[in-house]
A protein has these predicted regions:
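Conserved active-site and cofactor/substrate-binding residues in soluble primary-metabolism enzymes
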Residues: 1, 5-8, 35-36, 72
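A non-catalytic alpha/beta surface segment that caps or lines the substrate-entry region
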Residues: 25-72, 76-82, 89-99
């Protein structure tokens, strides 16, 4: 895979319990979401050269990447840190290499991704 560091980082992210709490009155809705931002994302943002990093009270973490050229347009990247109110403990991500179009069992097999139910899976034949 071309971006191995990216894949490794993503696989680390999905193992973190950032499950939403629909009954919470706070933003973010759980302490684990705040911890993810401050203890995982913040150091990684510093490591790739972002500056002026801040954690905002509404759950956003922001940083600045200085331009390397003059008079260029600015760009922003956003992503949310919470995940659906679904099991988020003991996540064991799978990497399906060279997808063959078959049903993909998830975890213990109670749930699956079936191309009959999810026809978009067919777009990924032969991909990782």
């Amino acid at each position: 895979m071309k971006y191995t560091n990216l894949l490794e980082r993503f696989l680390d992210y999905v193992k973190v319990n950032t499950r939403s709490d629909e009954n919470s009155q706070s933003i973010p809705s759980t302490k684990s979401q705040e911890d993810f931002a401050k203890n995982i994302l913040w150091p990684q943002m510093e490591a790739v050269g972002l500056e002026d990093i801040h954690y905002l009270s509404n759950g956003y973490i922001v940083g600045t990447l200085r331009a390397n050229a003059k008079a260029k347009k600015k760009i922003g990247f956003l992503a949310h840190m919470d995940t659906a109110d679904f099991n988020a403990e003991n996540i064991r991500p799978q990497v399906i290499e060279n997808y063959n179009g078959q049903i993909i069992p998830l975890g213990d097999g109670e749930y699956v991704l079936d191309p009959v139910e999810f026809p978009n899976l067919k777009k990924y034949l032969g991909k990782t």
